[in-house]
């Protein structure tokens, strides 16, 4: 669930983006969706006249609905920013992503998916425990990094209880975090790397 501060930050980002586009002379319409209102909300917008800056991460009250929004935009032939629904769905399936990376020969930290909190075959510490089927860092806090088997079992139980899904356990790699964004369909333009600054985070 989003905290009020997160919602305010999101609104501030939307206002900054909107004012920047309006300053360049582009018409801007800010749309909020609730429940099944997206079809109705988009009905007044001609796909050939608008680009959707898709910042929707979830339909309120509908878990794992980010891909649903992208699918609806595609079904209406809207041009939109962000990943297609198939990619969004894959990104929420961390186990699938790990299997894919391994199959392509790309290095990835040691990992395992556990429905049993005892995780008898895990022996690599420190480790990080996260929900296996959630977006980005949902379910991750300072408690997610575990140093021994007792902490591991506690955190796996936390994932099971609070998210009702298996836990993904990985070898914890300490260090800096970078994001690399790409633009394009087919031929991709890679943007400069951006480092995440966590200095203001309490956990």
Language-model features: locations:
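Glycine-rich phosphate-binding loop of ATP-grasp-fold ATP-dependent ligases
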Residues: 127-155, 177
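Short, hinge-like loop/turn segments at secondary-structure boundaries
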Residues: 46-49, 71, 97-102, 127-128, ...
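Phosphate-binding site of ATP-dependent enzymes
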Residues: 149-203
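Rossmann-like NAD(P)H-binding beta-loop-alpha module
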Residues: 102-135
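Flexible, glycine/proline-enriched loop segments at strand-loop-helix junctions
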Residues: 85-88, 101-102, 139-147
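Hydrophobic beta-strand scaffold residues
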Residues: 28, 79-80, 108, 127
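ATP-binding N-terminal substructure of ATP-dependent carboxylate-amine bond-forming enzymes
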Residues: 1-79, 86, 90-92, 96, ...
